């Protein structure tokens, strides 16, 4: 059997080799990704696609390849930089772009005069994926660039695909979309399906088949006996069928028997005017098992101090229940991020756990 073998980003562990059977189609036939580029995002032979992410990751590679197949133009940036991105949009009159939410955050942290110095009116479609986007961030991007922002939820595994446009999102704030490939299910730890609105593991029912290279245990853990499969995320579905992601299952914190999803605190702290980047995760606590820790990269690293730590903790507690907020904050000059923009949170967690083992991984 012929297969396609790609590697995941490795944000929750070592990068996984994902083996997917090749479709039985002729070489020149339109593949699923190329079809979606036209149907969802309006890509055509006149498209100028700007890629701020490296091409060794599945999504940027497949989007660039798809644009080439339909005759469009691809511009690949050597690396992401917010000012250089705006310069490239203006210089090349880019019409289409795919980003991750961190790139939105970095763009919004620019001074207003810097943001307004560039003409981005050529943009027709901007897609983001790979991580949940804080609601205030997406609102501000739609206000800035207009209702041209799309979102999808999918993985290298190819077992399903959710999508929403700006109109969908504005009427269902926080959603990552409805399933357009596969059927969504939310299940509990025993594999039983949960009703609308309840939080559980996110699974797709589809004909997509995959396995992890040289890791049968990982492959088995991603699938239920009925064939449904998961990318490892936790979330819920509303009454209209829209999916909302809570966090990665591997990042869930269990503190004193309470399940805490660090994405909530990350979304809050990201919006503070002094914060450039943030990671929230569980660290060992003798009494509670785990406690919530934040590691923050400030816009001005010289401001790192106990006073700023107290300011950020207070800011978080004003918007979230105290149990969901960090007990302490450490400051770093830079957080470990994949060149695609994904956060390597596991590297930070490993520093704090040492020889201990998290009870959730």
List the predicted regions and their residue ranges.
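Adenylate-forming AMP-binding core of the ANL superfamily, especially NRPS adenylation
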Residues: 132, 171-215, 222, 239-240
């Amino acid at each position: 059997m012929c297969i396609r073998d790609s590697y995941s980003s490795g944000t929750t562990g070592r990068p996984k080799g994902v083996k997917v059977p090749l479709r039985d189609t002729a070489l020149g036939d339109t593949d699923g990704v190329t079809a979606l580029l036209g149907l969802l995002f309006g890509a055509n032979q006149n498209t100028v696609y700007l890629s701020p992410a490296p091409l060794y990751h599945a999504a940027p590679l497949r989007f660039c390849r798809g644009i080439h197949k339909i005759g469009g133009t691809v511009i690949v940036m050597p690396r992401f930089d917010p000012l250089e991105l705006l310069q490239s949009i203006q210089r090349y009159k880019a019409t289409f772009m795919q980003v991750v939410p961190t790139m939105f955050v970095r763009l919004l942290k620019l001074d207003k005069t810097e943001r307004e110095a560039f003409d981005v009116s050529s943009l027709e479609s901007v897609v983001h994926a790979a991580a949940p986007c804080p609601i205030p961030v997406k609102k501000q991007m739609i206000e800035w660039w207009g209702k041209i922002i799309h979102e999808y939820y999918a993985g290298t595994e190819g077992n399903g695909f959710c999508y929403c446009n700006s109109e969908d999102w504005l009427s269902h704030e926080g959603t990552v979309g409805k399933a357009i490939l596969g059927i969504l299910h939310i299940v509990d730890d025993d594999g039983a399906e949960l009703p609308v609105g309840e939080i559980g593991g996110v699974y797709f029912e589809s004909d997509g088949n995959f396995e992890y290279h040289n890791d049968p245990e990982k492959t088995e853990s991603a699938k239920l006996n009925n064939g449904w499969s998961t990318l490892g995320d936790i979330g819920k579905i509303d009454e209209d069928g829209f999916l909302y992601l809570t966090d990665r299952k591997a990042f869930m914190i269990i503190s004193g028997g309470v399940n805490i999803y660090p994405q909530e605190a990350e979304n809050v702290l990201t919006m503070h005017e002094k914060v450039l980047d943030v990671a929230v995760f569980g660290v060992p606590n003798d009494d509670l098992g785990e406690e919530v820790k934040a590691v923050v990269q400030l816009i001005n690293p010289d401001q790192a101090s106990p006073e700023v730590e107290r300011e950020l903790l207070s800011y978080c507690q004003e918007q979230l229940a105290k149990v969901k907020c960090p007990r302490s904050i450490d400051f770093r000059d830079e957080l470990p991020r994949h060149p695609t923009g994904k956060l390597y949170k596991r590297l930070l967690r490993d520093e704090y756990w040492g020889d201990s083992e998290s009870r959730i991984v």
